[in-house]
Amino acid sequence: FLDLQLNATEGNVSGPSVGNTSSPCEDMGIEVEVFLTLGLISLLENILVIGAIARNKNLHVPMYFFVCSLAVADMLVSLSNSWETITIYLIANKHLVLSDTSVRHLDNVFDSMICISLVASMCSLLAVAVDRYVTIFYALRYQHLMTGRRCGAIIAGIWALCTGCGPVFIVYYESTYVVVCLVAMFLTMLLLMASLYAHMFLQARAHVRRIAALPGYRSARQRTSMKGAVTLAMLLGVFIVCWAPFFLHLILMISCPQNLYCSCFMSHFNMYLILIMCNSVIDPLIYAFRSQEK
């Protein structure tokens, strides 16, 4: 997806870009400082998120463990883009000399990190959606259904899956089937999460009225669950906005690579990378502002 070798050999130090030199449209150059600034902000924010959850025992619950997984994925995509930007700059200015083979391997590592982050983000968001669904609709059985051990197994499974999928997607990126598989995974998970949230928000009020009369039921717990669902719906919305251009780029790359309009859209790949990094910056802000609401 990204072409580190192309950027370095052409002396383009305005950030990583896609290897699409045939586009008749001018590429939108973005300065190195923009990538590095966003990467640093995202890294610090997500470290604070993970640290806050680790230190606050009240947050040692499945939902926040899944949020930690999402924060790690956000850190990974920011680190990969920042690291690649620095590498491009060093190679272009002759501060770092590598063989073509080494550059290609390094490029694959960066791209794999982005794919791993993507799959981990999608799976973590889905895990949180399922957790909120169980919390709201199976409140009395939640502690039994979502145990700490089960939560840990889910997170381990998520990262095992994404660690395996990421390199495969990059090694076989020229295969149309691989790109279609990645896009299909994205759309399927979005559809599933949207269905869960739609069902939650449409049925939650009626469900609450039915169980509110049960002995020992506390309305505050339900409000907290709904608050968590709203927060994660916001995270999902930001994820869609920030990652959708990247996936549209992939779709156009295999469906109409020679079309003028498609080529023009794909020539702005740097901007789509910036949007992806913005997602990593915005997520911790959502955690912070939503946690302050009563």
Curated annotation (Swiss-Prot):
The chain crosses the membrane at residues 30-53, 66-89, 107-130, 148-171, 179-203, 232-257, 266-289. One of its GO terms (biological process) is adenylate cyclase-activating G protein-coupled receptor signaling pathway. This is Melanocortin receptor 5. Belongs to the G-protein coupled receptor 1 family. It is found in: Cell membrane. Glycans are attached at residues 7, 12, 20. GO terms for molecular function: melanocortin receptor activity.
